[in-house]
Amino acid sequence: VLYQNDDYGKDYLKGFEDGLGDKAKTMIISKITYEVTDPTVDSQIVSLKASGADTFFNITTPKFAAQVIKKAHEIGWKPTQYLNSVSNATGSVLVPAGVDASTGIYSAFYIKDPTDPQFQKGKEWDDFVAFMKKYHPTGAMNDNFNVYGYTVGQTMVEVLKKAGDNLTRENVMKQAAN
């Protein structure tokens, strides 16, 4: 496991270990941290390879995730890789890391991937494109985080529509939960 040495990384690791339960002690053979100020995580990847790990959980942020994927590929380390949802954006992580290097990595995300042609059609896509052109014309259309921001904003729009003129905290929370 590679994780950021702060509350974000430690909390993500704790959740992972909690999920593994008693098996965590035997399944995780190496836990290595990095600092957000580190220029690269190359040395950490070399150390993880040297540990003999055949499975790797990448709990990093996008910049470091791309470095990890690329470095593991460069040094021939081919563990089964799991990438956290924070860093699985195709356009800003996987492509910069290299398509060959990114092939076979497991991850999950809860929004449509803007680089996937099957999602680049229909009213939702057209609305997203129109929004980006109007409000964020320099934004990358292939960036999951732009899609995420848009979907969060649209969720709030729906909540406020349902709340109508009754914009009390109680009613807004009621509509959000409904």
PLM regions with names:
Residues 2, 30, 83-84, 170-177:
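Beta-strand segments within the central parallel beta-sheet cores of soluble alpha/beta enzyme folds
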Residues 13-21, 49, 95, 129, ...:
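Class I S-adenosyl-L-methionine
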Residues 72-149:
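Extracellular/periplasmic periplasmic-binding protein-like sensory domains
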Residues 1-75, 118, 123:
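Extracellular/periplasmic Venus flytrap/periplasmic-binding protein
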Residues 21-22, 50, 74-77, 134, ...:
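Secondary-structure boundary motif
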Residues 134-146, 157-178:
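Segments of small-molecule ligand-sensing domains
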Residues 69, 73, 129, 157, ...:
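Generic hydrophobic alpha-helical scaffold/packing signal
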